[in-house]
């Protein structure tokens, strides 16, 4: 046993250490914390191995993270000097700072850490649209795209910020897929005016409207434009408009034009019919005439009336009945006025060679004579044995003589006189004339040209 005076001196350090351990008073200046600032490394194991079984640093708490600590060998507390702690952030959060902390001799952890919520890149605002997010661009935030009126969303409507700091799906866009709107007028029905086959129809040009940006690039019309004269029938009008996205809108309507009509008329047998306008529409007029050798009976003209009935009576063409019992040559000629042309053949005797040859040529050209409305009148002999003949009818000698005197036809020689439908002396012949030469002359007459047109329409010719 030693000196009693030395025992207090030997026990004093042990007592102080025990007291410090019980009161948690650090041996050096400093303050506890969870890593407010890094100080020194953990190379104090040997010099501070004395404190490895003593709580030293403050417990680590990481919001939105988990802490996994390992005490030094032989240690008991996970906040003892030299303890190493691994920091892991929860899903959707990322670590800022060191992933491993060490409890240092200054009672501080080697670094300060924090788990921050992960953030995705800011979404691009779609043109002509936008988006709304639940929690901005942070993890698990859901954003929903929307488009302005007239635009359609293309792509995924909803995206979510994922753990890899990327958005689910591709960014959406707003495209103009809605066609422009255009409204056409209603069906228009019109009735043609008298003697007309068309109706002037007008309407306001329809205006298109684009539901997106309101801009239209083209307006195309198919059909007659407004203000046109529409013929009889059913006409389809179509307007098409395009917007800048090349979407098209279409509207259609119809224009109906009706022509009021009477029943169709036919030309009388052995006659002609010439009608105005379309021949049977309200207001149309049809005129009738007969071929040479026939006389018109009934109405010379008929009109399609508002009650859709024809005026007058139905015409007909009757064979011309020449009256040779009239007293004067003028009265005889009046029967042919505007109806027939006359070719008067005069000879002092039936034995005249020119007369016989000429009559033979005319008989062979009877079709051409009929086509040109020519009646042959024969004056044969010298008064009082003079006779006149119109085909099968014989005129009295006195009437035949008057005709010679009226037209100044020589009494004692062969001659011919061509008289037109107006009683005019057109040509005289003192020798033979071929039917072709005669026909060529007559075909130059103005009235004959109109006849030729009608005959062509009716298909009348000497070739048929």
From Swiss-Prot:
It comes from the Eukaryota. GO terms for biological process: autophagy; negative regulation of cell proliferation involved in contact inhibition; phagolysosome assembly; positive regulation of extrinsic apoptotic signaling pathway in absence of ligand; response to endoplasmic reticulum stress. Residues 1-28 form the signal peptide. Normal cells and cells transformed by human papillomavirus type 16 E6E7 and polyomavirus large T. Suppressed in cells transformed by oncogenes such as V-SRC, V-ABL, V-FPS, V-MOS, V-SIS, V-K-RAS, and polyomavirus middle T. Disulfide bonds join 57-85, 69-103, 89-115, 120-161, 147-174, 262-304, 290-317. SMART domains: CCP. Residues 57-117, 118-176, 260-319 form the Sushi domain. The keyword Repeat applies. InterPro entries: DUF4174, HYR_dom, SRPX-like, Sushi/SCR/CCP_sf, Sushi_SCR_CCP_dom. GO terms for cellular component: autophagosome; endoplasmic reticulum. Glycans are attached at residue 34. Residues 177-259 form the HYR domain. Keywords: Disulfide bond, Glycoprotein, Proteoglycan, Repeat, Signal, Sushi. The keyword Amino-acid biosynthesis does not apply. This is Sushi repeat-containing protein SRPX. It comes from Rattus norvegicus.
